[in-house]
Amino acid sequence: MTQLALVIDLNVCVGCHACVTSCKEWNTSGWAGPLVDQNPYEGSPTGTFFNRVQTFEIGTFPNTETVHFPKSCLHCEEPPCVPVCPTGASYKRPDNGVVLVDYDKCIGCKYCSWACPYGARELDAQQKVMKKCTLCIDRITDAKLSERDRKPSCVLACPANARLFGDVHDPDSEVSIAIRERGGYQLMPEWGTKPANHYLPRRKTRMHIDPEELTRVDNPWRKEDLTDYTGEETLDDVAW
């Protein structure tokens, strides 16, 4: 069975939030094809997020690092949010493995959010239904779009190419190769949910930089023919 998913490279992500804003834009405008939900955020564009980027500082000062961690629905192969839904609103598509919510059936009971160990579901305070990442199901299944554009908006928007999209069950796909060759891992596999989304780990980069290289090559103060300061008053000494 096809299992579409995201692979996110934590070594490349710079935390710019382009994926977050593009997700908001796509899921509120619908400029290129029918949406599964015509207005997923209702009147408040700040309310519900399908995708978030969490930023952490790790290590002990002064040897610290900043880690940006994008997080959304992982489209698990064994999604715990599906069997707990009393109305059948939460379901997993058999053709591509994407986990979705039928808003017409959802009663906002939050059972799915309690069952999800990743905190990927949020209650839309205005529509009173649970919402989450859909992998831009309207884009990836829209035959009117070119193959290049049939990807989630967050993937297309990422300036660092930190987000990959494809079939993790296809061993020859871009995502499968990245997982295999670059040590891709699942988030909390001990829960037995078999998350389809994977992360590529951060890699330690060691380099030696000469102090001289930290100074801009076009810095005029590096010129040897500068006139020595005579001690006379200059504009820099004037209190404005």
Swiss-Prot record:
Keyword Transmembrane in the entry? The reply is: no
Q: How is the cofactor bound?
A: Binds 3 [4Fe-4S] clusters.
Task: List all membrane-crossing ranges.
Answer: none
Q: Which residues bind [4Fe-4S] cluster?
A: C13, C16, C19, C23, C73, C76, C81, C85, C106, C109, C112, C116
Record-linked Gene3D superfamilies: 3.30.70.20
Q: Which UniProt keywords apply?
A: 4Fe-4S, Cell inner membrane, Cell membrane, Electron transport, Iron, Iron-sulfur, Membrane, Metal-binding, Repeat, Transport
Enumerate the subcellular locations listed in this protein's record, separating them with semicolons. Answer: Cell inner membrane
Cellular component (GO) terms are:
plasma membrane
Report the GO molecular function annotations. 4 iron, 4 sulfur cluster binding; metal ion binding
**One Pfam family this chain carries?**
Fer4_11
Q: Which PROSITE patterns match?
A: 4FE4S_FER_1, 4FE4S_FER_2
Cofactor(s) listed in the protein's UniProt record? [4Fe-4S] cluster
CDD domains annotated for this entry? PsrB
Extract the SUPFAM superfamilies matched here: 4Fe-4S ferredoxins
Topological type in the membrane: Peripheral membrane protein
| Residues in 4Fe-4S ferredoxin-type domain copies | 4-34, 64-95, 97-126
Subunit-structure text? Forms a heterotrimeric membrane-bound complex composed of a catalytic heterodimer (SoeAB) and a membrane anchor protein (SoeC).
| Purpose of the protein | Part of the SoeABC complex that catalyzes the oxidation of sulfite to sulfate. SoeB is probably the electron transfer subunit.
Protein's recorded name = Sulfite dehydrogenase subunit B
Its gene?
soeB
